[in-house]
Amino acid sequence: MTSNQSHKAVVFGSISIDKIVNKYGVFSNVLGGSAAYALLANKKNTCELVGVVGDDFEKKHFNLLSEHSITTNSLTQLGGNTFCWGGEYKDDFSSRKTLYVDPGVSESYIPDLSKHSKNCPFLLLGNTAPNLQTELLNQMQSKPFVLLDTFKLYINIANKELKALIKRVDLFCINFNEARALSGMDGADVKEMSKAILDLGPKSL
């Protein structure tokens, strides 16, 4: 799918095939990923999706993303498996634990933005590896409003890279458990944790 529409925003992050375990049952082969859900939450054809999938990515998933993205020129398909994630949610859905993660083709993927994308006014860096988020931000030629998302896995395994990126963004999105892990303040209240995270350099939280 191609389009001459202006690029209002670039949405980048994970596109995955998930296995979800919750009180209602076990759900396999579910379309997941931060970029996929961020794209689908927006009005159709206002954002460009940037990401990678494997050759196991089902056509029904591709068609759904194609219907919502301005173009799929930046949705790369490589030989191999799509990023996979399995998670189990508490009965009240207040938290989850990761059962497994398989990065698949995303492990060797380097994003490459189009000229239009490099000059868009808004950039959403959805949850994915901080080194890939940084690579994409470095390609921007404009100075977009940057929204950054992450989750506990990357706080634990890529803390240094994540903190270097946080200071470059306009809005950093994080939940309570992630804030506790990032701030290292297990017994602190929300205000104290928020101050510690804002001290890392994001303009807002």
Specify the residue positions occupied by each region the protein language model found:
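Conserved N-terminal subdomain of the carbohydrate kinase-like
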Residues: 5-8, 17-29, 44-124, 138-143
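Short gly/ser/thr-rich secondary-structure transition/capping motifs
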Residues: 103-108, 150-157
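Conserved phosphate/ATP/ADP-binding segment of small-molecule kinases
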Residues: 141-143, 154-205
